[in-house]
């Protein structure tokens, strides 16, 4: 629950095709259903499959539509290296939820560069931030029924944080309102798997 004068800032990033925009819409609708003001920034980058995408959500009493430097309460990264790129939005107590499955951009091969080891990315984050939650999102999504539920696995991880102002119930209601009924059970399973992983970490 937010105080009237507070805002809660969520930065979501990854690549196109991972469900980033849909995740943002689900959070935003849940916030409005709970009576909060909410604004979602313009999408940066290309939303088609493979292009970098980021959205910024501000819930509550916001002064602008963008998240200022070091002011994110949560960074939700669908791709490990994108979490690193988003760190200008983070402070030491920002909750960082990241998918551990990399999507290696073709540009790395073009310039004979290699993708950093995911373990090194996570280790560096743990050295510098208090709340880092790596999730093998692809594994849990497949266990839930389909890789397409990856975004709901990661969203489940976000809402497990004690400071998250929205209830799991309202997130689930919004998910059901935004996805076809035949996908409800799979995505509910995905939310629960991500939620349980972070709650028990």
Predicted regions located by residue number:
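Active-site cofactor/cluster-binding pocket
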Residues: 1-201
């Amino acid at each position: 629950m937010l105080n009237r004068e507070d805002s809660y800032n969520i930065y979501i990033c990854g690549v196109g095709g991972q469900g980033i925009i849909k995740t943002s819409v689900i959070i935003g609708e849940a916030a409005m259903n709970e009576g909060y003001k909410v604004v979602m920034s313009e999408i940066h980058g290309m939303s088609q499959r493979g292009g970098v995408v980021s959205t910024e959500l501000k819930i509550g009493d916001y002064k602008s539509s963008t998240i200022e430097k070091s002011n994110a309460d949560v960074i939700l990264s669908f791709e490990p290296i994108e979490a690193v790129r988003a760190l200008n939005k983070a402070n030491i107590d920002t909750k960082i939820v990241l998918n551990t499955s990399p999507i290696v951009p073709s540009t790395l091969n073009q310039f004979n560069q290699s993708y950093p080891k995911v373990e090194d990315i996570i280790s560096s984050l743990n050295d510098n931030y208090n709340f880092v939650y790596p999730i093998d999102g692809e594994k849990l999504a497949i266990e839930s029924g389909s890789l397409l539920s990856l975004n709901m696995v990661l969203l489940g991880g976000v809402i497990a944080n004690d400071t998250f102002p929205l209830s799991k119930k309202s997130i689930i209601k919004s998910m059901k309102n935004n996805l076809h009924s035949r996908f409800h059970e799979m995505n509910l399973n995905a939310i629960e798997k991500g939620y349980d992983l972070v709650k028990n970490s």
